[in-house]
């Protein structure tokens, strides 16, 4: 009984730690010029919660320690590749096909709570093909060579 009381007290107290409670979605500045609506839909479904400024924060994003993990993952995802800040250099855009092929993205721990992000083999291949067409074979380009960039319409 004593352990339960201390455990409950600890669970309540960690909610007071401020990290992970401020969930922001900065403005969308630009997206890539997607080769098709299907590519955009697949990337939205499987990638946008961590790799965009359009994160859908689930209810458990407000409960520590899950809030800490989610905040860390979204911050890391956005810093590595952000599909909604395409006006800035995205040095990891060239890695999309490799990460999806290896099964590293979307990560295994994301899928149980986000079943829509689970892609079939055909969908993975369509995402890879569409991303290669949309982002180019080199992935990210220098800002001066980003002719395929389009502003986001609201």
Name each model-derived stretch.
Residues 3-154:
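Aromatic- and Gly/Pro-enriched helix-to-coil junctions and flexible linker segments
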